[in-house]
């Protein structure tokens, strides 16, 4: 399996000279050749639209603060609590896509990393940090809507702009801390059988596989998704409960458009990232040799690569969702005209 060798080598336990999976699983070479040809262009396309879309989103959120931008404005617009979270999510997506050109080149070179050890660690660490930052921000966004809609009378005492800003800061710090192992353990090593110098994770001990699974699949997915499902279930229940009362109101319940935007963002995030975490868990089972069948190893390996880049799509989908499913950007755009 190419990605097993290139991403999670254990030089203390397995020889770099003869990875068993390379010689025993040759049936998917044509599939890998196709991926090497197709995925780099796909990743660059995602990077282009992700950069363009998220830069536009951030400009619409942040530029009204700049007095020199529109001298005729009578007052400055302050970001709402929802906008603070969404601006941070756009910033996270922007930082995330900045690392994609390096991986596009890496795949185009058949995992031969040409940028050196420092960029190997920095690019991998930044991508890993933003994986956590993104899902933690989705939890925070869902929790904020939950408080506003399910406990509207008491939420005003808790929902403060400074609190939202502090929450976002803590999320960025948490993402950085959780990415430290990636910064420390990523390195460029020669893999003779593949004739490449690969940017890989070098685990010093078998137990690191379990630690990585807990970090990635539990802290980075299962626990946040449980919270997201809980909050959004009650949000939908609250909206259903308000439906009868809002029938006579023009436009429906207060905040329903913003809530619709956020629910769409949450659904998009889960659809894009669930396959990645599913195959990441299967990859963990391969690493600890619970899965040993060659065909399953190839399915896991190829599936993880495809799911990886399917997850990247989320970074350029979010700006489209802001425009087509929500009123926040429309309000900001009209305010600058």
Swiss-Prot record:
GO terms for biological process: cell migration; cyclooxygenase pathway; G protein-coupled receptor signaling pathway; inflammatory response; negative regulation of blood pressure; negative regulation of cell growth; positive regulation of leukocyte migration; positive regulation of release of sequestered calcium ion into cytosol. GO terms for molecular function: bradykinin receptor activity; peptide binding. Residues 63-83, 143-164, 239-261, 327-337 are cytoplasmic. GO terms for cellular component: plasma membrane. It comes from Rattus norvegicus (Rat). This is B1 bradykinin receptor. The gene is Bdkrb1. It is found in: Cell membrane. Belongs to the G-protein coupled receptor 1 family. Bradykinin receptor subfamily. BDKRB1 sub-subfamily. It is a multi-pass membrane protein. CDD domains: 7tmA_BK-1.
């Amino acid at each position: 399996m190419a990605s097993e060798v290139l991403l999670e080598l254990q030089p203390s336990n397995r020889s770099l000279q003869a990875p068993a999976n390379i010689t025993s699983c040759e049936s998917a070479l044509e599939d890998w050749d196709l991926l090497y040809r197709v995925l780099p262009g796909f990743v660059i396309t995602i990077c282009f639209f992700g950069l363009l879309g998220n830069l536009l989103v951030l400009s619409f959120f942040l530029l009204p603060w700049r007095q020199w931008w529109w001298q005729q404005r009578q007052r400055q617009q302050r970001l709402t609590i929802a906008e603070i979270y969404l601006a941070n999510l756009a910033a996270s997506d922007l930082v995330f896509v900045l690392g994609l050109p390096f991986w596009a080149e890496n795949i185009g070179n058949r995992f031969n990393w040409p940028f050196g050890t420092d960029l190997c660690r920095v690019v991998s660490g930044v991508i890993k940090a933003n994986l956590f930052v993104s899902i933690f921000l989705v939890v925070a966004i869902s929790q904020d809507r939950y408080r506003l809609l399910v406990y509207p009378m008491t939420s005003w005492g808790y929902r403060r702009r400074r609190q939202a800003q502090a929450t976002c800061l803590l999320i960025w710090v948490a993402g950085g801390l959780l990415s430290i192992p990636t910064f420390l353990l990523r390195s460029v090593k020669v893999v003779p059988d593949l004739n490449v110098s690969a940017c890989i994770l070098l685990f010093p001990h078998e137990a690191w596989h379990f630690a990585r699974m807990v970090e990635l699949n539990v802290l980075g997915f299962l626990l946040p998704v449980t919270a997201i499902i809980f909050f959004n279930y009650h949000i939908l229940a609250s909206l259903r409960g308000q439906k009868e009362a809002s029938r006579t109101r023009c436009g429906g319940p207060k905040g329903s458009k913003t809530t619709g935007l956020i629910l769409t963002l949450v659904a998009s995030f889960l659809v894009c990232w669930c396959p990645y975490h599913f195959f990441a868990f299967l990859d963990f089972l391969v690493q600890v040799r619970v899965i040993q069948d060659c065909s399953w190893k190839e399915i896991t390996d190829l599936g993880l690569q495809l799911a990886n880049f399917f997850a990247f799509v989320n970074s350029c989908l979010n700006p489209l969702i802001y425009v087509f499913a929500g009123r926040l950007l429309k309000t900001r755009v009209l305010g600058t005209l």
